[in-house]
Amino acid sequence: MANLKEIRDRIKSVKNTRKITEAMRLVAAAKVRRAQEQVLRSRPFADRLARILENLQSRMGFEDAASPLMQQRNVETITLVAVTGDRGLCGGYNANIIKRTEQRFAELKGKGFDVKLLLIGTKAIGYFTRRDYPIQATFSGLEQVPTADEANTISTDLLAEFLAESTDRVELIFTKFINLVSCKPVVQTLLPLDPQDIADPEDEIFRLTTKDGLLTVEPGAGPANTEPKIPSDIVFEQTPEQLLNALLPLYLQNQLLRSLQESAASELASRMTAMNNASDNAKELAKTLTLDYNKARQAAITQEILEVAGGAAAVG
C-alpha cells in the first residue's frame, strides 16, 4: 500500500481537479443557455424565408426552377463539410463527427464518386490532414457563438465551387442538438438546394435553474410554431426567378448558420455532461482514496503500538 504522504498528495490533486471540472461544467451550462437562445432568435427569420421559397417554388414548379442552385445534375464530385470544435474535453462530440465523416467518405468512394472535404474546426483539420485526405478548404477559430459573417464566408466558398461545377453536390455533416443529453451526427444535403420547413417538433428549451443548491440546466417544452402561412395570392414585384436567385444564397447561408449554431450547442452540452461525469468520478475517487488513507494510517498506528509493546516486553 502506498505511504501516507503519497495518498494525501493524490487526494489533494483529485480535489483540485474536481474544482476545475466543476467550474467548466458551470461555464458550459451557462453557455448552453445562450446558444439555445441564439437558435430561437434566428428561427422566425429562417422559417419565414423557407416558407417564401416554398411558395415561389410551388408557383414555378420544380422542373421550371431556373436557379442553378436548385438544378439537379449528374453527380461526379461531392464535397463533404464536417463541423467539429476547436477544443476537446467534450466527450465523444468531435470523435463522432470524425467517425461519421470517414464512414460517409468511404461509402461515396466505394460508389465511384470523387470526394473532397471542407473542414470546420481544428479537431477535424488535424485528424484528416495527418491522414492525407483530399481537403478543399479549412476554417477554424470560429466564435463560440457562430455569427452570420462566419457562415457567409463558408457559404461563399461552397457557392463558388458549386457554380463553377468543381463539385456537383455538397453534404454537411454536423451534430444535431436534440436535447441536453442527446445529440447525434447527421448528414444533410446543402447543394443543390431544396427549401424545407425549419421548425423541428423535437426542439426543447433549456433553462438555468438551481437544484439541491447547485446550478443545473433543465429542459422544457419548446414554443408552439405560430408563424402564419404565406398567403397563396400574395403578389411579388419581381418575377419568381429573380426572387429565387436573390434569396437562395441567403437561404444557404442561413441553413449553414443554423447548423453551426446547433453544433455549438451540442458541443457545449457534451462538454457539460463530460465535466459533470468527471466531477462525479473525482468525488468517488476522493472518497476511495480517503478510505485508503484511513486504512493506511490505522495500519501505521497499529504497527507502532505493536513495536512499542514488543520493545517493552523485550526490556521487561
UniProtKB/Swiss-Prot annotation:
Stored Gene3D superfamilies: 3.40.1380.10, ATP synthase, gamma subunit, helix hairpin domain
Entry annotated with the keyword Transferase: no
Subcellular location: Cellular thylakoid membrane
Subunit-structure text: F-type ATPases have 2 components, CF(1) - the catalytic core - and CF(0) - the membrane proton channel. CF(1) has five subunits: alpha(3), beta(3), gamma(1), delta(1), epsilon(1). CF(0) has three main subunits: a, b and c.
Protein name: ATP synthase gamma chain
InterPro entries: ATP_synth_F1_ATPase_gsu, ATP_synth_F1_gsu, ATP_synth_F1_gsu_CS
Stated role: Produces ATP from ADP in the presence of a proton gradient across the membrane. The gamma chain is believed to be important in regulating ATPase activity and the flow of protons through the CF(0) complex.
Keywords: ATP synthesis, CF(1), Hydrogen ion transport, Ion transport, Membrane, Thylakoid, Transport
Organism name: Synechococcus sp. (strain CC9605)
GO cellular component: plasma membrane-derived thylakoid membrane; proton-transporting ATP synthase complex
Top-level taxon: Bacteria
Family the UniProt entry places it in: Belongs to the ATPase gamma chain family.
GO molecular function, one term: proton-transporting ATP synthase activity, rotational mechanism
Membrane-related topology note: Peripheral membrane protein
